[in-house]
Every structure is written in structure tokens, then in C-alpha cells.
């Protein structure tokens, strides 16, 4: 979604919506990895019914990852996608339905954004390749050492678009994957799987929402179904709220900024391409055994609990003394609608509303102040009341001028603080501090040595700094009156106040008077006094707001509508919108896949199109050559970076495009015609599913007509089933489209075409909670907790899905022991991470173990709940006889789980119970005393350095 900072703002404002996922890792024995049994209870202590996968959010990171080497070929990409789905399935473990949705042909309103993204990706890819080649030649000319350039074809991510051979092959691979899991994985035993590939029109997340809406409208639908949607787009949160399902959770990757990446030239860590010096690669390990290994950093996942977000919104949106009855569900719909003004995939955001400036909070406050005058809510089941929206927007327009001035003041203050900070740091720090192995270390850190990483790079930086110092102190360098060296003659001294990066030119200057005239003149090339044009822009934007809300709540209102401008109007221009029409043409049809490719692809990606179609992009005599500019301008629009700007691409004229394609349609081969046709969804079940026999019977009877799906056999799911060609059938071999994977010779799964329940075009899906739905128990601290809490118990926040989870504690000696095994300073390498992984203590609501933490469960093997501890383990069980050559016995790491009630006469010191009198000298020498009588258990050493000899 077009709100890059929306999730960051949401997670900071409503922190309790986030829960870290618990993932059960596969165990490895003798080099063989045993798969996880997903039929067992979910380790997150919650059971999900349906899992929906927005597949494009999986395909992109698997085909061109940013934090690890990319797959070498298409087969490896498919395997990476399979493994990613396995991870998500292992975490969520759905019990009823798995719905995989790949983006199909998008509405025309979305195609403009897709076109901008793909043109940018092509342009940035070529520019990056040229810059890389330029830097490579410069380094080699200076005598630098670089690995030989690997000759390989660059993966064009634009192929992840409906109609390409890649997407067609992906659909085949996913059908094979589903059949394989239904045959072999016990967690898939009773699961219904629906695959909506790229041939089915619609965006992936909206196909999922359309399925949920249509199933909710059925009488057999379970109103307490627990949904889990996988995807990283911010609009999934709004879509989940729009369903009004009380049990809705989103799972997504946890965003971690500034991940280390290898240099694209020398493949070494620690610098970017622009800073590469072409230094020889350091030996990694004694025998260079770690040469090709990158720092292990497996992606982690988080849950977003929309039920908790609803709790937050209920507190924030509840209003008293309204002239009408307060309805929380309607207020949630209004909140979703107001978020559209900040940005979305179909409309540019209003100039005065920035998510980073608290625009949503500002809108909510105005909404709560004005709603008493409006006489009702802004929306109802996806339809907008424009008269009430006009009151909100004009209220925003009244403060637009102050918003722009405050934005300028905040920006100037930020720059001033940054300059002062740089000056202060330059004054308070020495001119040069060596880093890496040469950096000065405190005496207390000698017990935690830091690994040497790329010392040649560090030595090079030190030599360069020495040269600069020698230049400054050379005889040709004159001295100022205060004795400081001054630059040599002929060299222009850099201003101390100059910024390292030039500021983009802003011709609009929204903080100065006349901003509206300058805006319309620069952005639309019209005078602000042209009231007719301004009203046209506002009307198009209002149509867009109505179209987007209808898209979220009722489905696509029109496949052909789009916003025909690059920029949005001002909020103060929303006058007289109450009488503007907001109806859309009925019966519109989506583009065909190859037609969409012609509408969104640049000429550089024309190799994914048939030859004669490709020629229309490059032939100077082509009637649509103007749709494919080789270069285009990017308007920063007041922003700092190019990716934040607006790509000024010409809009595609659908009439001209179709007229040009009529001449080349006869050139399509049968295979291309098949890829150019629109398809539907496919349903899969295994042999143990109650629906399996019913589907097999349809094939045996050779029935070709659609039949109603029996809801009693499939958890209330309804729809139409139709036998299809090339179906997966029992006892029929399923050939593997990936050469490295085996064929399924003993298949027992079956597939059939599936179509959602159909409704009249004028049918309205009600945006409300269904009868019989049970509200989840509250998670947030009650506002009257202090008044109603009579026993004085402190409020214990809920960290996971289960409020009744009993916490397990460690005593102080256990934490001290962990402190010995871990580095003292943050950021220093060590065997373990600095944060104690509570997941090893039996808590299912903590982050899974990272690669460096896998040994901690071994250190905590004797961990027991507090109630069951009956004293220390006998000495002979903890200290078995060591043999020569054995690994160091970490018996002192046997830790006690909780602070216990010690027997009388025992001293409770920092390390736990002690059965001997405590003296100051004993405290100092305690860790160096040998085992002896009166000491029933082992004690930890005094520091991380422990001599076992």
C-alpha cells in the first residue's frame, strides 16, 4: 500500500497488537532433518481455522532476496517458495482451509501504480548495473583486486506479472506442491486447499477478501472462524478491519532495518559498492572454510492481532452525548475511510496530510469534533456520504496553511539540530579513532575478545588517514593565526555549514503565501483561478475515494476507472462535493493478461511478450510508441529521495492500446492464447478429507456441469465445483515441474475447479459483526483497573494469545550464570545473544532461538517449575567422571528455575541458597573453591574465562 510509514506508526501507537511468533524448529539427527509434525497443537497456544497467503509477498523475497544470495535459477526459486510456505504453515497450523492467492490482472486504477513500479524497477536496475561497471573499471585501473565477473542473466522481477511464462510455471509448481503435502504431511490431512493463480483476475489480497465476504453471506458460515492472513502490505490491516470478523490475525515478517549486505563487487561485508576499494579477501577461518558463508540471520515473524486493534479503536473512537446512537462498527469503517486520505495504491495522498506528521490523529480529532454536526457516520457498508465528508475536509482545509508552516519549521529545526550535533561530536571526539582490531578496549573487556573482521580494510583506512595527516602537516601547509593548519592554496575550503547532500529544489514553497497558485501552475500547468479545472480534479479524487471504499467492502465497482492525474488536490478545494456523482459503470471487464503486460511493462521487459507485441514498444512507427518512453522524469514533490517522488509517466489510453493490439492478436500461438485467457480457482483435498469421495464421484460420473459443494463436508464452505482438465486425481502420477524433485507416483489427492457463491450485481454485503459471533476476551488494561482491583494485584499484561499462561522464573544465580556465558557489552560477538531467549524456558510467547542461541536449552536442561523444586540435585548426578579428551563439562550451568523458599539457616545471597556462613573473603573466593564437603552442588566460575585444565 502507498503508506510506507503506516505500520510503523500503528505499531508505536498501539504496541499491544504485536505478538512474536513461536516457531518449532525441525530437529536434525546424524545429518538428517526430521520435519515438524504440524498436526500437533500450535506452540503459540492458539488454533487458527483458515490461513490465507498473499503469494506475491512470498514470491518477491524468495526470487530476489535482499539479505542473502539470490537463487541461481528458476528451480531454486520454486524450492525457496515451497520452504517459505512450509515455515508459515508450521507457525500458523490451520485446521480447515489454506487459501493461496496470486495477483491476477488488476483493476485499471491499480495498473497505473504497477506501471510506475515496473518502469522504475527497470530504470533503477540499468542505472545500478552501469554504476557497478563504472566503479569496477576504476578499481581495476588502480590495481585493485576483484573476483572475476560472474556471467549470469539478471533476474527481471517484472516477470512476476500475470501472463508471463514464469507465472504459468509457478502455478504448475504450486499444484505439485499442494499435492505432495496432502499426500505426506499429517498437518494437511483434513485441510481444504484453494489455489487462485495468476490467471484468476484480481489482486491477491482482494481475492481473499472477496472469498471471506461471500462465505460470510452464507447461512452455514461459522461466525467464530479464526482467520490468519499472511502478507506485508499495510492495507491488509484495513482489509482485515473491513471484514468485521472478531477473530482476525495477520502474520508478517518482522522488519529489521540496516541488515548487513555483501558488496556487489567483491562480495565482502562491511561496505557498499560505492565504497569498495578492491582489497584482497581475507581468509575466513584457518582453512578458509567460511569463505562463502554470510552472517546467519533467519527472518522472524510477528502476529498482528486485529482484535486488540479493535480494542484500541473502541477506546479512541467512543464518543458521548451524540445526537444519534453510537455504533462502534460504523466508526471503524469511518476510521478505515479516513486512512485513505493519507495514501493508498490508487490515489495520491493529500499534500497537507503526512502519516509521519500525525495526519491520522489529526483526522480523528477533527472527525470527533465535527461528527456532532454531521448527524451520522461518513460511510455505510462501503458507500460514502459526501455531504458529511465535505464537512471533515473543509475543517482540514482551514488548518492547511498552519500545517505547511509547521512542516517547514519542523524541517528547519531538525536540520539545525543535526548541524549542532555534528559540531558537538566533532568537538568532543578525537580526530581519529582506529577501529576493528586496533580500537582501544577497556580493561574489563579483555575476557571477551572481538573477532577480527577484514583487517586489510581497516589497515587501508588507517593508512589513508595517516596520509591525510601527513598532508596537513607538510611544509607547504600554512598555519592560521591560531596555529591550526589551513588548506593549501588553490583548494577551495568547504563551508562548515554545508550539507553532505544537496537539498532538492522546491518551487512550490507551501509555507509561503501563494502556495495554491504555485502548486496548480507547477503540477497541473493551469492557473489556480481556473475553477472548472480544479473542480474536475476534485471530482476525480472524490470518485476515487468512493471507488476505493467500495473496493474494500463490496468488491471491484469498475475495472476501467482510474484517477487521471499524478497529484491530489488540497483539502480546502473540497467544496460542493455533496452533489458530485459517485456511480460507476456496470458490467465492466478486466484486461486480459497479455493486454495488461502491454499496459504496465517498459520496453526493457518486452522479452516476456510475443515478438510482434514486443515490436509495438520499440518500433518508431508504432501507434503507441509514446506509451514506452526510454527515460522519464521523477518529481521529488518536496521529498528527499527518488523512491519517494512521483514518476511522470504518460497514462495508457485503453482505446488506442486495444486498437493497436487487434493487428497482432492473430500472431499468438496456442500456448500464448492459453496464457492470455482468464481462469479460476482450484480446490484440493486429500484422501482423508470428507469431501474427497464426493469429488472423485464427479469425475467417475463424467459430469461436466457445476454442482453445489456440500457445506456439511467442508466446515460450511460453499461454492460450485466443476471437473477440470489436467486435474490431480488419485492413483495418477503427478509429474514434478522441478527436476530436482521427485514425481508423485502414489498420489491420493484430488483437485477440482471451484467458484465462490454468486450474488446479484446490486447485492450489498453488510459491514457488521455476524449474529452468534463471540467477542474475544479483552487484552488491554481496563481503564478502571485501579478502582475495581480490590485485592491490590498488579496488572499483568498479556504477552501472547493465552492470558492464563503460567510464567516460569529463574533465580538470580541462573541469570548470573547466563551473564558469564554471554558478552558483557552489547554488540560484541559471543556464543549467545545479549537478550535471554525466554523461549528456551518453556514460554511459548517469546521470540524463537537464533542460530547463536541453540546451545542455551542444553544449559537449561534441568529447568523445572517453581512448585516442583525440592532442593538441589545430588552432586553425583551433576558431576560425572570426566574422561580424557572429553568436552568441558558445563555442570555449573545447571540452573534453578525460580527463587524458592529457602530452609531456615541457609543464607540467601546473590547466587542462591548457601549452607555455610557467608564471610566477605568467602564471597571473593567463592568461585575458586574446589568441590568439598558441605557444598552439595556446583557453583559458577567468577568470570567468562574458566580454566578446565
Curated annotation (Swiss-Prot):
Q: Could you tell me where the Polar residues compositional bias lies?
A: 438-452, 469-484
Q: What Pfam families does the record point to?
A: XRN_M, XRN_N
* Extent of Basic residues compositional bias: 416-427
**Main localization of the protein described in the UniProt heading:** nucleus
Among the GO molecular function terms of this UniProt record, one is: RNA binding
Physiological role: Possesses 5'->3' exoribonuclease activity. May promote the termination of transcription by RNA polymerase II.
Name this protein carries in UniProt: 5'-3' exoribonuclease 2
What is the phylogenetic placement of the source species in the record? Eukaryota, Metazoa, Chordata, Craniata, Vertebrata
Gene field: XRN2
Amino acid at each position: 500500500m502507498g503508506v510506507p510509514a503506516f505500520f510503523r506508526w500503528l505499531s508505536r501507537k498501539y504496541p499491544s497488537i504485536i505478538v512474536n511468533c513461536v516457531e518449532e524448529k525441525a530437529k536434525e539427527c546424524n545429518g538428517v532433518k526430521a520435519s515438524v509434525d504440524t498436526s500437533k497443537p500450535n506452540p503459540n497456544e492458539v488454533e487458527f481455522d483458515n490461513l490465507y497467503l498473499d503469494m506475491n509477498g512470498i514470491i518477491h523475497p524468495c526470487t530476489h532476496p535482499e539479505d542473502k544470495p539470490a537463487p541461481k535459477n528458476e528451480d531454486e526459486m520454486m524450492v525457496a517458495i515451497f520452504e517459505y510456505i512450509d515455515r508459515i504453515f508450521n507457525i500458523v497450523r490451520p485446521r480447515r482451509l489454506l487459501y493461496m492467492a496470486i495477483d491476477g490482472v488488476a483493476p485499471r486504477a491499480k495498473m497505473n501504480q504497477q506501471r510506475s513500479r515496473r518502469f522504475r524497477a527497470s530504470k533503477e536496475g540499468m542505472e545500478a548495473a552501469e554504476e557497478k561497471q563504472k566503479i569496477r573499471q576504476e578499481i581495476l585501473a588502480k590495481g585493485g583486486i576483484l573476483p572475476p565477473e560472474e556471467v549470469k542473466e539478471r533476474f527481471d522481477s517484472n516477470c512476476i506479472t500475470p501472463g508471463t511464462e514464469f507465472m504459468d510455471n509457478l502455478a504448475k509448481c504450486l499444484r505439485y506442491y499442494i499435492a505432495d503435502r496432502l499426500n505426506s504431511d499429517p498437518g494437511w490431512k483434513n485441510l481444504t486447499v484453494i489455489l487462485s493463480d495468476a490467471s484468476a483476475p484480481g489482486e491477491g489480497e482482494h481475492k481473499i477478501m472477496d472469498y471471506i465476504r461471500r462465505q460470510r453471506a452464507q447461512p452455514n458460515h461459522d461466525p467464530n472462524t479464526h482467520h490468519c492472513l499472511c502478507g506485508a502490505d499495510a492495507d491488509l490491516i484495513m482489509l482485515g478491519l473491513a471484514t468485521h470478523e472478531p477473530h482476525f490475525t495477520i502474520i508478517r515478517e518482522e522488519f529489521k532495518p540496516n541488515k548487513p549486505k555483501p558488496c556487489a563487487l567483491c562480495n565482502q561485508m562491511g561496505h557498499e559498492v560505492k565504497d569498495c576499494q578492491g582489497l584482497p579477501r581475507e581468509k575466513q577461518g584457518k582453512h578458509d572454510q567460511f569463505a562463502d558463508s554470510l552472517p546467519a540471520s533467519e527472518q522472524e515473524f510477528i502476529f498482528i492481532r486485529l482484535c486488540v486493534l479493535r480494542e484500541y479503536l473502541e477506546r479512541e473512537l467512543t464518543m458521548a452525548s451524540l445526537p444519534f446512537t453510537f455504533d462502534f462498527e460504523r466508526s471503524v469503517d469511518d476510521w478505515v475511510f479516513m486512512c485513505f486520505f493519507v495514501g493508498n495504491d490508487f490515489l495520491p495522498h493529500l499534500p497537507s496530510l503526512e502519516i509521519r506528521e500525525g495526519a491520522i490523529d489529526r483526522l480523528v480529532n477533527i472527525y470527533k469534533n465535527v461528527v456532532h454536526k454531521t448527524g451520522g457516520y461518513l460511510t455505510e457498508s462501503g458507500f460514502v456520504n459526501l455531504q458529511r465528508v465535505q464537512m471533515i475536509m473543509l475543517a482540514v482545509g482551514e488548518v492547511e496553511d498552519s500545517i505547511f508552516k509547521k512542516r517547514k519549521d519542523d524541517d528547519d529545526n531538525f536540520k539545525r539540530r543535526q548541524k549542532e550535533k555534528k559540531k558537538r561530536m566533532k568537538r568532543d571526539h578525537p580526530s581519529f579513532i582506529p577501529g576493528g582490531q586496533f580500537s582501544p578496549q577497556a580493561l574489563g573487556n579483555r575476557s571477551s575478545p572481538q573477532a577480527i573482521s577484514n583487517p586489510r580494510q581497516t589497515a587501508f583506512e588507517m593508512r589513508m588517514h595517516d596520509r591525510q595527516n601527513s598532508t596537513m602537516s607538510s611544509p607547504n601547509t600554512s598555519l592560521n593565526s591560531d596555529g591550526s593548519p589551513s588548506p593549501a592554496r588553490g583548494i577551495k575550503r568547504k563551508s562548515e555549514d554545508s550539507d553532505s547532500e544537496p537539498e532538492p529544489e522546491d518551487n512550490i514553497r507551501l509555507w509561503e503565501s501563494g502556495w495554491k497558485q504555485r502548486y496548480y501552475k507547477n503540477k497541473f500547468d493551469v492557473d489556480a483561478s481556473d475553477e472548472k479545472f480544479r473542480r474536475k480534479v476534485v471530482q476525480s479524487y472524490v470518485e476515487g475515494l468512493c471507488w476505493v471504499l467500495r473496493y474494500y467492502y463490496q468488491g471491484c465497482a469498475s475495472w476501467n476507472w482510474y484517477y487521471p492525474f499524478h497529484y491530489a488536490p488540497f483539502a480546502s478545494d473540497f467544496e460542493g462535493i455533496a452533489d458530485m456523482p459517485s456511480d460507476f459503470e456496470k458490467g465492466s471487464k478486466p484486461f486480459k493478461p497479455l493486454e495488461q503486460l502491454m499496459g504496465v511493462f517498459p520496453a526493457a521487459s518486452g522479452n516476456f511478450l510475443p515478438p510482434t507485441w514486443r515490436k509495438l514498444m520499440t518500433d518508431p512507427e508504432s501507434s503507441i510508441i509514446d506509451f514506452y518512453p526510454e527515460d522519464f522524469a521523477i518529481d521529488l514533490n518536496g521529498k528527499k529521495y527518488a523512491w519517494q517522488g512521483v514518476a511522470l509517466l504518460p497514462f495508457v489510453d485503453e482505446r488506442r492500446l486495444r486498437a493497436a493490439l487487434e493487428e497482432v492478436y492473430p500472431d499468438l500461438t496456442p500456448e500464448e492464447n492459453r496464457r492470455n485467457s482468464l481462469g479460476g480457482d482450484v480446490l484440493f483435498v486429500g484422501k482423508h478429507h470428507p469431501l474427497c469421495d464426493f469429488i472423485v464421484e464427479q469425475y467417475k460420473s463424467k459430469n461436466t456441469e457445476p454442482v453445489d459443494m456440500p457445506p456439511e463436508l467442508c466446515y460450511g464452505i460453499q461454492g460450485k465445483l466443476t471437473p477440470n482438465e489436467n486435474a490431480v486425481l488419485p492413483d495418477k502420477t503427478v509429474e514434478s515441474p522441478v527436476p530436482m524433485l521427485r514425481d508423485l507416483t502414489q498420489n491420493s489427492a484430488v483437485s477440482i475447479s471451484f467458484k465462490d457463491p454468486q450474488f446479484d450485481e446490486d447485492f450489498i454485503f453488510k459491514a457488521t459483526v455476524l449474529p452468534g459471533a463471540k467477542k474475544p476476551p479483552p487484552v488491554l488494561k481496563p481503564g478502571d483497573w485501579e478502582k475495581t482491583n480490590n485485592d491490590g494485584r498488579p496488572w499483568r499484561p498479556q504477552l501472547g494469545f493465552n492470558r492464563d499462561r503460567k510464567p516460569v522464573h529463574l533465580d538470580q544465580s541462573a541469570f548470573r550464570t547466563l551473564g558469564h556465558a554471554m558478552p558483557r557489552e552489547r554488540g560484541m560477538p559471543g556464543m549467545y545473544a545479549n537478550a535471554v531467549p525466554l523461549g528456551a524456558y518453556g514460554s511459548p510467547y517469546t521470540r524463537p532461538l537464533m542460530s547463536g542461541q541453540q546451545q542455551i536449552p542444553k544449559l537449561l536442561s534441568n529447568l523445572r517449575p517453581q512448585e516442583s523444586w525440592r532442593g538441589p540435585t545430588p552432586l553425583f548426578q551433576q558431576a560425572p567422571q570426566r574422561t580424557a579428551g572429553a568436552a568441558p563439562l558445563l555442570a555449573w550451568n545447571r540452573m534453578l528455575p525460580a527463587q524458592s523458599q529457602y530452609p531456615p539457616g541457609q543464607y540467601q545471597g546473590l547466587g542462591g541458597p548457601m549452607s555455610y556462613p557467608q564471610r566477605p573473603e568467602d564471597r571473593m573466593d567463592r568461585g575458586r573453591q574446589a568441590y568439598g564437603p558441605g557444598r552439595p552442588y556446583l557453583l559458577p566460575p567468577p568470570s567468562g574465562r574458566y580454566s578446565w585444565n
